[in-house]
Each structure stands twice: as C-alpha cells, then as structure tokens.
From Swiss-Prot:
One of its GO terms (biological process) is translation. HAMAP family: RimP (MF_01077). This is Ribosome maturation factor RimP. Required for maturation of 30S ribosomal subunits. The lineage of its organism: Bacteria, Pseudomonadati, Pseudomonadota, Alphaproteobacteria, Hyphomicrobiales. Coiled coil: none annotated. The gene is rimP. Keywords: Cytoplasm, Ribosome biogenesis. Belongs to the RimP family. One of its GO terms (cellular component) is cytosol. It is found in: Cytoplasm. InterPro entries: Ribosome_maturation_RimP, RimP_C, RimP_C_sf, RimP_N, RimP_N_sf. SUPFAM superfamilies: YhbC-like, C-terminal domain, YhbC-like, N-terminal domain.
C-alpha cells in the first residue's frame, strides 16, 4: 500500500460522481464537508426501511470515527433542511467508506495499490465492462489491473482509463483488513500528535 499525504488529497476531485437527485444533494453538502476537514465519498438515496439518504465521507487522512459521523450529520442536516432537495420524509445516515470501500479518487487507487478490486466501466475495455483483479500500477490516466480469473485466451493484465470507470470497490481480504487497520491506527496517532502539538503551541502563546 502506498502512502498519500493529507495536503495532496484535501481538494482532489472525485473520478466517480452522482447523477440526478444524488448529485444535487452532493453539491449542497460537499462545501460543508470540506470546511469541516472531510471529503465526500458517495451520496446515495435508498428505499430500504423507508427513504434513506446515505452519505459516505472520511477525513482527509482517510480516518472516520463514530464521533466524526455525528459531527457531519449535525452539520449537514440544517443545510439540507434549508435547501430542501428531497420532497419526501427521509432518514439521514452518515458513515465511513468501510474497509471494502468504494474507490472514487485517483489517490484511492494509489493508496490501495496491491489489493484486489472489482470494477465496472461505462464503455467496453478490451471487450468487457466488468473486471476483478489486483491493482498493480497507477498513472495520471488510469490503472493497471492483474486479473485473478481471466477468461480463456485473455491476457491477465488490463489497463483501465479513469474516464471509463463507472464503479469500483475493494474486495475484502485478510491482507486488506490488516493493512486498513494499520493505516487507520497510524493516521489517528498522527492526528492526535498534531492536536497535542497545537495545544502546546497555544499554551506557549
């Protein structure tokens, strides 16, 4: 897994975005999230258990706690009430991307290089639209996937342009769980150390 810095990720645009009502909601809440130090991952309306607005987000360092979810929920709820993009009663659900997360930014592919991914494209890439395999390299325009189950006669390696990507998600494995927990622990420790430094700096002033 490759590391990416918080500064590089703070204003990085998403490769995969919403359409329709989901897009309208995303446009409303994303500036609020950015001001709080979070990045929007995905917005999705769901009809399960009534109408549910699912907002998936994370801090710029990739972490997300229960307290963070509560903070985001309290911040975006009044904004949604004022803008009123949804004309029906709904339940707001704020969550982290999870370990088997959606991949929506180029930095996601860099960070999780070496792990298994499943994805779909909006156009045919080497004769198909669905792929599964390990991320082996990433450049400005796309990523290279080493398929773990290539069909007979197919090359294992395939290059997928970011512009063709319609959906992508990590596949849960023991290795992914281990690396994700390690990365989360390191990021939270770094954030705590930075907060302590800022407090000490204020005390000196």
């Amino acid at each position: 897994m490759s590391d990416t810095t918080t500064a590089e990720n703070a204003n990085e645009p998403r490769l995969i975005t919403e359409t329709g009502l989901d897009r309208r909601v995303a446009d409303i809440i994303e500036p609020v999230l950015v001001d709080l130090g979070f990045r929007l991952v995905r917005v999705r309306m769901s009809g399960q258990n009534g109408l549910t607005l699912q907002v998936m987000t994370e801090r710029n360092d990739g972490t997300m706690t229960v307290e963070d979810c509560e903070e985001v929920s309290k911040a975006i709820s009044p904004v949604l009430d004022v803008e009123d993009p949804i004309d029906k009663a709904y339940h707001l659900e704020v969550s982290s991307p999870g370990i088997d997360r959606p991949m929506v930014r180029r930095s996601d592919f860099i960070r999780w290089q070496g792990h298994l991914l499943k994805c779909e494209t909006s156009v045919l890439v080497e004769g198909r639209k669905r792929f599964r395999g390990k991320i082996v390299s990433v450049d400005e325009d796309g990523f290279r996937l080493e398929r773990d189950q290539p069909a007979y006669g197919e090359e294992a390696g395939v290059t997928i342009p970011f512009t063709a990507l319609s959906e992508a998600r990590l596949i849960l494995t023991d290795e992914l769980i281990r690396d994700a927990l390690t990365a989360d622990k390191k990021a939270k420790a770094a954030r705590a150390a930075n907060e302590n430094f800022e407090e000490e700096d204020r005390d000196i002033e």
